[in-house]
């Protein structure tokens, strides 16, 4: 640097010093405070970005949870509509059982007797109507006889020794089982074949 430049810098520094008299010390260092302010702004900006990302994540989670709750509610409502008659149908099954027992208990000679033909026809018509109503509401009888035991639909009550069919095959149905659409309403109570001793 030349002497003239040094003199100018010194003169400028002296003027600046004179102007700065009376200014508090913490306000005099402009360069340091600008850097500190810049650092503070950068830190604040990073903090805000981090908070924004966290808020976005929370919003996404809340939206996903809301969708899941809505889907669960829709499924629950659909199930309630589909299976609303379950309790009532389960209670009516005993009536269906009693009608079937009544029909099975009528001897052949009474079926042909003119005095009882109307009664037998009425009981049989009632059974058919009940079966029709069951079908309208999705209640169906579970097939059992001659099929292999399915623990999801059948309940083995006893074992019957026999060589006529494969072991595990249903050979006797003591009580009919029913489904309501795709759900078990009541299992079939059955006797299952086993190998004789």
From Swiss-Prot:
Gene3D superfamilies: 3.90.20.20, Head domain of nucleotide exchange factor GrpE (2.30.22.10). Residues 1-31 have a biased composition (Basic and acidic residues). It comes from the Bacteria. GO terms for molecular function: adenyl-nucleotide exchange factor activity; protein homodimerization activity; protein-folding chaperone binding; unfolded protein binding. The keyword Chaperone applies. Residues 1-48 are annotated as: Disordered. InterPro entries: GrpE, GrpE_coiled_coil, GrpE_head. Pfam families: GrpE. GO terms for cellular component: cytoplasm. SUPFAM superfamilies: Coiled-coil domain of nucleotide exchange factor GrpE, Head domain of nucleotide exchange factor GrpE. Keywords: Chaperone, Cytoplasm, Stress response. GO terms for biological process: protein folding. It is found in: Cytoplasm. Homodimer. HAMAP family: GrpE (MF_01151). Belongs to the GrpE family. PANTHER family: GRPE PROTEIN, GRPE PROTEIN HOMOLOG, MITOCHONDRIAL. NCBIfam families: PRK14140.1. Participates actively in the response to hyperosmotic and heat shock by preventing the aggregation of stress-denatured proteins, in association with DnaK and GrpE. It is the nucleotide exchange factor for DnaK and may function as a thermosensor. Unfolded proteins bind initially to DnaJ; upon interaction with the DnaJ-bound protein, DnaK hydrolyzes its bound ATP, resulting in the formation of a stable complex. GrpE releases ADP from DnaK; ATP binding to DnaK triggers the release of the substrate protein, thus completing the reaction cycle. This is Protein GrpE. It comes from Erythrobacter litoralis (strain HTCC2594). The lineage of its organism: Bacteria, Pseudomonadati, Pseudomonadota, Alphaproteobacteria, Sphingomonadales. The gene is grpE.
């Amino acid at each position: 640097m030349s002497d003239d430049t040094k003199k100018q810098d010194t003169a400028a520094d002296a003027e600046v010093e004179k102007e700065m008299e009376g200014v508090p010390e913490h306000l005099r260092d402009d360069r340091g405070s600008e850097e500190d302010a810049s650092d503070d702004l950068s830190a604040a900006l990073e903090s805000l970005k981090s908070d924004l990302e966290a808020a976005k994540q929370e919003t996404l989670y809340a939206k996903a949870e809301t969708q899941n709750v809505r889907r669960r509610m829709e499924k629950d409502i659909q199930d309630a509509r589909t299976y609303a008659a379950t309790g009532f149908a389960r209670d009516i099954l005993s009536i269906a059982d009693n009608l079937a027992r009544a029909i099975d208990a009528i001897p052949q000679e009474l079926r042909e007797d003119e005095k009882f033909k109307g009664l037998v026809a009425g009981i049989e018509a009632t059974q058919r109507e009940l079966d029709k109503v069951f079908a309208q509401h999705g209640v169906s009888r579970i097939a059992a006889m001659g099929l292999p035991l399915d623990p999801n639909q059948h309940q083995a009550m006893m074992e019957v020794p026999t060589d006529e069919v494969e072991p595990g095959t249903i050979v006797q149905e003591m009580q009919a089982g029913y489904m309501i659409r795709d759900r078990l309403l009541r299992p079939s109570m059955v006797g299952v074949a086993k190998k004789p001793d």
